[in-house]
Curated annotation (Swiss-Prot):
Recorded coiled-coil stretches: none
Phylogenetic placement of the source organism: Eukaryota, Fungi, Dikarya, Ascomycota, Taphrinomycotina
Family, as annotated: Belongs to the UPF0538 family.
Source species of the chain: Schizosaccharomyces pombe (strain 972 / ATCC 24843) (Fission yeast)
Entry protein name: UPF0538 protein C2C4.04c
A GO CC annotation given for this chain: nucleus
GO biological process: 'de novo' protein folding
Amino acid sequence: MTGATLTVRVIRNFEYRTLKNVVFHDIDLATTTVDQFKKIIDERIQTDPSLKIYRTTHFDTLKIYVKAQQHKTQNLAINLDHDDWILNDGAKTLSLCGIENETELSYFELAAYKAYQANPVQKWL
């Protein structure tokens, strides 16, 4: 499918749930690779004024949060289940990774995710 719409949760901090949802339109799932999509996200972070506070964070990992028409998790920032949904192969196209139109993804720093996964405490409450 061409022209997919994807929502990406750009996560700066897990504990304080500092995140911003960013919508990307017209993404060609059949030809866009994971690494290319990360570059598209990084470019948006660097140019969109609403994402200014995210520019100093090192983002390196994409993970599927939820596929279209499926149940969301209780954690509104990240899906702590399904570590197999982390998109490790940057050369794979998005469609080969199981991404469909209206899939929601999380974009974050892997080291911060692993630390939060080991101790999932929310400090913003």
